[in-house]
């Protein structure tokens, strides 16, 4: 686990950032360059609202989506930390495709109200502090498809305009602090003649330019004065920053305030590469001989030239250098990168996925963790890097709170209240240890799966356990049901009948096919103390002790927890979906691409991606792999 040693950076404070609200500093009447000139430096809330869980219904509790990739739920305190650290811009990557449904009455796609309200809440945390906020559509399965065709364009247009029509209505009166980004990194994921991460080709450029125009027309057509002057960001092919890609972006006629959106984790062999050509010293050269300073100089000179030619600003929506335990080099890189960007008039938005350097795991090209979200403090290896960034862009008032490890509250039966009408299915006073993703059967659990009951699990772990239904029909047979956020409290997770039915419906299965039910550790180890069937109309226990003991399920056999009996297959290196005999962040990225339908797997890859051996690949496998690779600090 990461711990704060003596060398941890102390709080860096150059004053207290001024607190103010957007209402007190309304921004209006600016042109595109006027807006971007005020965007000093930004921060991405990465792998949070852009995470997805395709096993959930479109109107599921948002927390289940935003925590699906292993990050804690975002909080206002996190955004406060970002603001106080000197950032005046927040980009909120947001995935929508799992939260929309087709409305036959209007022949349009609609966004779930619960998701839209959640997105608005997060936007407001930053907007109400006078920060610039970039809201986008991110990992969309209708944008990133194998091959761009007329049919895929028709689908993409219908869904994209449906989403943005509603977003523009909800935020119609927000001033120029709120910026809309039409798409994230639009690209073809399975076209052998057009590389997914290359420059693109004429067909893909035309395709993306049409979608960009559809986006602009949708926002401008909403009608509010604010949306008429809102800054809109337009990406090229995969939001690449190459001269060919950016030059191919067409600015729609009469589009008003627009900016080009680019991403550049450069120089690549310093910032992300882990192969033999990587060199994580700065300044320096790659294994191919390319000079890092020269590469950055060329990049920003080229972007400045294109910006001048097209007459629109450019925003670097994502940039970062992965943490290879090379803090001083990253600090020098940050100064070089941002000084050149500043000279070119390009504001930059730092990518932060909350993944820190892990000495046990070694080099990781996706360790872009700057703010530790469990305690809203700065990762030790990133404090000097952030200080270099702020100093370079001219921010003088900022506070970087010293790293503090998360300490989970201690479990005690004294802090758990059991209702007098709860039916005890299992109890272990000392707790049953379950390893991550370990399901174990609880006798008599299935008996209470009805509208008359819900389940309560008393547990102790950072990540709440799940309840698993095993069936012999449908698409798989093992279905994880996550806790009900509206009912659960510390140390007690609740699972309702509707939660189970929603999971079964999404997998084309039914309750009649259930053979057994299990309690399971989720994406981290867990200790299970009790499992209870709770009457649906049961009152939440008060702080007073129950006057009677909970009902114990009568049985002729002792209440036991037993191992599942499914045979396992031949041993493979679980998680190695890249088939390179190692398990790294590259495997996490590839698995995520599979889940958003931008990658296909061979049988061997499928077997290795099936982390919990349930013959299915879903978000639970992605979370398990991600935890294994880089997010196990809090469990150790």
Residue ranges and their predicted role:
Residues 54-63, 96-117, 141-156, 188-200, ...:
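Surface-exposed, active-site-proximal loop segments in enzymatic domains
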Residues 70-89, 100, 106-139, 146-182, ...:
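An active-site-proximal structural segment forming one wall of the substrate-binding cleft
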Residues 7-18, 540-636:
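Cellulosome-associated attachment modules in secreted, modular CAZymes
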Residues 158-289, 301-321, 343-344:
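Active-site region of glycoside hydrolase catalytic domains
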Residues 46-74, 103-111, 152, 269-295:
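Acidic/histidine-rich helix-loop elements
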Residues 326-409:
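Aromatic-rich peripheral "rim/lid" segments of glycoside hydrolase catalytic domains that contact
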